[in-house]
């Protein structure tokens, strides 16, 4: 495979429901959508000589928020492409921006990921992944989550019913919300809403047990075994693995109603990205000492 670096201009559609994806009063482009864009570009351009299975990605980072303006309909972006070998390719989604005085134009990367042209067998889930724990559980109603803890609009209310939190992890029923019918990449990686909802669960868990509003900043590996489908329900297990230098690490397992593993994320990294300006409400820490 050619090891040269390629930069491809992109015009990305901004669908109306993206306006419900907000952080600190600003609308931000969803990270799961950025991954769909990158996977779709690989599929369109046929970078691999073998069949491309887009559901295997690693070393993924959500570098900077891509802020959207109210009513914005498109994003003029760049995709930086760097083939690694015959089975791996690294891509990043970036935009141009001007310095404050307008004298210079620079590139800002928003998402980077390495995609693999290979598949892996579905692992056997251990009991901790399949069954809820027997330790005390703190339950959080969905309306409280999206009103006070993860204040996204209705289009991104992926957690159904109530979220169950224990020291050993978060347990959620998720709804794959509808994608825009005009989205050409809507089936590329399956629905992005279940993973987005799992990140919401990790954010709430972080608020309860660590007192920090943690948002995803990347992951080590994500494998999609069975693409999720819009309008369907799924179950997420968000399992804490480590805490270091302000970053919380999780593994995420998303299963369907039959108990089949749909996707697994290892080394999901979450941290406070507000600089300490956003803090959890007191009630979510009730009983934590």
Model-derived regions: residue spans:
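Acyl-thioester-processing domains in fatty-acid/polyketide/NRPS systems
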Residues: 1-289
